[in-house]
């Protein structure tokens, strides 16, 4: 049995090792997490074969569920991208005269972000911000910051996004409930961290026109886009199916045939599988795409997920090593003796890791590995709430270590100081508001 000082030192050094190898030595996060796994196993006295077996089971156990959902979700996102469905949502919301332009960008980010990776969402939707900025003579910062903040929020707190799904799965949280709570918290955080924060700044927010190098980026011709009804149906279908499963679990007898059917179609794998074929028809065939074209788009989409799958698999390995080495159990006792509220702890760990590593996904996986062991000591706090707390922390502190920071800086034509001052602050405010929303939810449910 290792001393508590040894356990804490091992964990802290492993986190520093992850940060240094990623930030300083430019290791891929997959390699950094595996290196940290071997380090923890060695320091905790695990045998070589035990380490390998734990890493193997960690990767397999994690990707066994998530690989299919991430793959299917990628197809959905790709169909949204190539069909112009995301632009359709933005153009339709633009017609709502009672909504301000910055609030429209938040709603576009939240809805479209459900099926799009955050960086893809920024690249795909920023032309809409350019278009509105030109028409209304508005500072691009006032539109791009709410959009990117909303995309980041939904990326961190709403399954079936990979990191949010990973956290919910590892904590044993109900995915349908996490979706509902995540959308509520994400909307509140995005509105306050985006439009409200920028409104508070008023004239202090500098005017930023569309950069000349992006002046040619335009929204597609509206006549070529799918209908709003078809778009929303496709985007919301997998979420609706997963919510039906949650409702069935709360209200139906387990032995009924209907309950079994709803459990089946509401499973994230089945729900996204059904949604993919709906997307193929609604956003593909009805838009005059051939099956060959859709196959090409699907293959192109799969090429982009190898990175995220490897990172998530390595995160599962790190988690498995913490459990197998008994570090997790000792850590749970140490954390419980700190008398810090688990919601605050989950948020703080994810926030710090995101700032250090620059990846919300890695931050959420690391926070899950640290916080999960102590959950049995707090039976009154649901795993759904902790999942939202971890995601809320990962929203904040988008700084120079995060590629999204540079993407926003580039598209807005902002200086380094301006990006820190306005975008980093916006994400931090959104993160704090999301934390407050999580605490509020914990008192209600």
Swiss-Prot record:
Keywords: Amino-acid transport, Cell inner membrane, Cell membrane, Membrane, Transmembrane, Transmembrane helix, Transport. GO terms for cellular component: plasma membrane. It comes from the Bacteria. The chain crosses the membrane at residues 5-25, 29-49, 57-77, 106-126, 140-160, 178-198, 224-244, 265-285, 302-322, 343-363, 385-405, 425-445. Pfam families: GntP_permease. Disruption phenotype: Single deletion, grows on D-serine, D-serine plus glycerol and D-alanine. A double dsdX-cycA deletion grows in D-serine plus glycerol, but not D-serine or D-alanine alone, growth on D-serine (but not D-alanine) is restored by dsdX, while growth on both D-alanine and D-serine is restored by cycA. Double dsdX-cycA deletion cannot take up D-serine. It is a multi-pass membrane protein. Uptake of D-serine is inhibited by carbonyl cyanide m-chlorophenylhydrazone (CCCP), and at high concentrations of D-threonine, stimulated by D-cycloserine and not affected by D-alanine or glycine. Coiled coil: none annotated. Protein that allows transport of D-serine across the inner membrane, does not transport D-alanine nor probably glycine. Is probably a H(+) symporter, as CCCP inhibits transport. Transports D-serine more efficiently than CycA. Belongs to the GntP permease family. E.coli CFT073, a uropathogenic strain (UPEC), was originally isolated from urine, which has a high concentration of D-serine. D-serine is toxic to bacteria. The abililty to take up D-serine coupled with the activity of D-serine dehydratase (dsdA) may allow use of this amino acid as a carbon source in a sugar-poor environment. This is D-serine transporter DsdX. It comes from Escherichia coli O6:H1 (strain CFT073 / ATCC 700928 / UPEC).
């Amino acid at each position: 049995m290792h001393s508590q000082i040894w356990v804490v030192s091992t964990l802290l050094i492993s986190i520093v090792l992850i940060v240094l190898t990623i930030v300083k030595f430019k290791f891929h996060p997959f390699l950094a997490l595996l290196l940290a796994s071997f380090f923890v196993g060695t320091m905790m006295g695990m045998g070589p074969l035990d380490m390998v077996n734990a890493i193997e089971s960690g990767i397999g156990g994690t990707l066994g569920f998530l690989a299919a959902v991430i793959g299917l979700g990628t197809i959905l996102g790709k169909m949204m991208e190539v069909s112009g469905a995301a632009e359709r949502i933005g153009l339709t919301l633009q017609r709502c005269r009672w909504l301000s332009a910055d609030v429209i960008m938040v709603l576009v980010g939240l809805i479209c972000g459900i099926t799009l990776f955050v960086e893809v969402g920024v690249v795909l939707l920023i032309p809409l911000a350019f278009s509105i900025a030109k028409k209304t003579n508005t500072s691009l910062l006032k539109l791009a910051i709410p959009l990117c903040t909303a995309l980041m929020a939904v990326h961190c707190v709403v399954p079936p996004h990979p990191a949010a799904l990973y956290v919910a799965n590892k904590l044993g949280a109900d995915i349908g409930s996490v979706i509902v709570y995540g959308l509520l918290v994400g909307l509140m955080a995005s509105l306050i961290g985006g439009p409200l924060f920028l409104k508070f700044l008023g004239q202090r927010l500098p005017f930023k026109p569309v950069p000349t190098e992006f002046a040619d980026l335009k929204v597609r011709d509206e006549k070529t886009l799918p209908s709003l009804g078809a778009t929303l149906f496709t985007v919301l279908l997998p979420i609706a199916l997963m919510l039906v499963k949650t409702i069935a679990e709360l209200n139906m007898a387990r032995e009924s045939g209907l309950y079994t059917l709803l459990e089946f179609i509401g499973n994230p794998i089945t729900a996204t599988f059904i949604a993919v074929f709906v997307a193929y028809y609604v956003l593909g065939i009805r838009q005059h795409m051939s099956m060959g074209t859709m196959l090409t788009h699907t293959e192109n989409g799969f090429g982009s997920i190898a990175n995220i799958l490897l990172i998530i698999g390595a995160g599962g390995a790190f988690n498995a090593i913490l459990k197998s080495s008994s570090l997790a159990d000792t850590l749970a006792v140490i954390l419980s003796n700190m008398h810090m509220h688990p919601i605050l702890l989950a948020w703080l760990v994810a926030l710090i890791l995101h700032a250090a590593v620059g990846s919300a996904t890695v931050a959420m996986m690391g926070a899950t590995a640290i916080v999960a062991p102590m959950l049995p000591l707090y039976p009154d706090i649901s795993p759904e709430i902790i999942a939202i707390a971890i995601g809320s922390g990962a929203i904040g502190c988008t700084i120079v270590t995060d590629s999204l920071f540079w993407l926003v800086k580039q598209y807005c034509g902002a200086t380094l100081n301006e990006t820190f001052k306005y975008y980093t602050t916006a994400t931090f405010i959104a993160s704090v508001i999301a934390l407050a929303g999580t605490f509020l939810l914990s008192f209600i449910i």
